Design a protein with these regions (language model features):
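Extracellular/luminal ectodomains of metazoan preproproteins built from arrays
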Residues: 1-29, 56
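Extracellular/periplasmic catalytic domains that process cell-envelope and extracellular macromolecules
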Residues: 22-25, 61-63, 89, 125-129, ...
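Extracellular/luminal ectodomains of secreted and membrane glycoproteins with large N-terminal domains
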Residues: 1-4, 32, 54, 156-161
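Von Willebrand factor
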Residues: 23-136, 141-147
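VWA/integrin I-like adhesion module and closely mimicked acidic/polar interface patches used
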Residues: 139-161
Length: 161
């Protein structure tokens, strides 16, 4: 009679997914936030919350990532320069304190402001790091021809119903 002791591996449960590490490469990010009439107060508040959660994953506190923000409707509303907030908490506070206004969707005015004012050294833009512009809107600009910009790749993030 022969006896064998064979170890059969017990399947282990799949570990839960780990959160992604914060973005570590240097980057200057400008968020362009639509506050036009079609957004509505509720969606504007949801967008602020989303943006606050998003920036918590960025490496702002080390200075690796700089963030700015522009709101728009009939024109440019709030403008927060890239060198205005050196911590996640400070930028989140600025986001959550934004007040909703109404108006048309003049995306072209906001993008022109980003190009001429935000992406300058005076506003904290660094010439040696990539720039990223994230537009959060619920629809098309009231002036689509003026909104078209050369050499910019758009990745729309839909906000709305």
């Amino acid at each position: 009679m022969f006896a064998y002791n064979v170890a059969v591996p017990t399947p282990r449960p799949t570990p839960p997914p780990q959160p992604l590490p914060p973005l570590m490469c240097p980057v200057d990010i400008v968020f362009v936030l639509d506050e036009s009439g079609s957004i509505g107060t509720s969606n504007f508040d949801v967008t602020k919350s989303f943006l606050s959660q998003l920036v918590s994953r960025l490496d702002i506190d080390s200075g690796n990532t700089r963030v700015g923000l522009v709101t728009f409707s009939d024109g440019v509303g709030t403008s927060i320069n890239l060198n205005s907030h050196a911590s996640v908490r400070s930028f989140q506070s600025a986001i959550l304190s934004l007040r909703y206004s109404q108006g048309q969707t003049f995306t072209h005015d906001a993008l022109a402001h980003v190009r001429t004012t935000m992406l300058t050294s005076a506003a904290g833009d660094r010439s040696n790091v990539p720039n990223v512009v994230v537009v959060l809107t619920d629809g098309a600009s009231n002036n689509p021809t003026a909104t078209q910009v050369k050499n910019i790749v758009f990745y729309p993030i839909y906000n709305g119903r």
